[in-house]
Design a protein with these regions (language model features):
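Long, charge-dense low-complexity segments
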Residues: 1-226
Length: 226
């Protein structure tokens, strides 16, 4: 019999512990947990693939990395992650190490906005003189050019892909090995607490009287901060 607990990532340490405690309360005490992705808004394909023995810590770190990406980096990630995800969901396992490392170096990839097809890319190439042969053609003859074919050749040369109306030049992207599969890169520590209390001055008549002075505190707390 299987027991499971849903956990939305990234999660705080106490949330992860609560999820694990739920499994143990149901009798799942052998230390073996199978982890699968139910939904990933940024990369829906993750719900269809098989991950190569991911740990909960890896999944949480990966979720933190995705959450930290800006809009352009998200577009690039969706483009370059296609190298990692198999075309056949039933195929090879997907490495968590590669997924994590694929969230780095994204700011080095060129993006062209409002370019979502080969024809639009061809026009972009013409307008910006990106190809020497095209740039040498007189302006009065540009209308004769096959924009779609020019865009197709440029895309194939760049190894580029279209993502949500953007052209992402992924051919020059080299995935850095920031995560070695054992030790996570340095990151800012997150606050841990067993529980939180909202503390305020004692009211005289109504609780609303002191609502403005209320503050949240996390327990346990260091004596110096108390």
């Amino acid at each position: 019999q299987y027991y499971y607990a849903d956990l939305e990532l990234p999660a705080a340490e106490y949330e992860i512990r609560d999820a694990l405690h739920k499994l143990r309360d149901f009798g799942q005490t052998d230390g073996f947990f199978e982890i699968s992705v139910l939904n990933c808004e940024l990369l829906p394909a993750l719900a269809e693939v098989r991950l190569d023995s991911p740990t909960l810590d890896e999944m949480n770190f990966f979720a933190k990395r995705l959450e930290a990406l800006n809009e352009e980096e998200q577009l690039v990630f969706r483009a370059v992650s296609r190298r990692i995800l198999p075309k056949n969901p039933e195929g090879e396992l997907v490495s968590m190490k590669d997924l994590i490392n694929c969230t780095y170096g994204l700011d080095q990839v060129m993006i062209a906005s409002n370019v979502g097809s080969d024809e639009q890319l061809g026009q972009f190439v013409i307008d910006n003189d990106l190809h020497e042969d095209v740039a040498s053609i007189p302006d009065n003859a540009l209308y004769l050019l096959d924009k779609k074919q020019i865009g197709k050749l440029q895309r194939e040369s760049d190894g580029g892909v279209f993502v949500d109306g953007h052209y992402v030049v992924t051919g020059d992207y080299t995935m850095p090995e920031i995560y070695d599969g054992k030790t996570f890169p340095d990151e800012a520590p997150t606050e841990w607490f067993a529980f939180r209390l909202e503390v305020a001055e004692a009211p005289v008549n109504s609780a609303d009287e002191t609502a403005g002075s209320a503050e949240w505190i996390s327990l346990p707390i260091d004596k110096k901060e108390a």
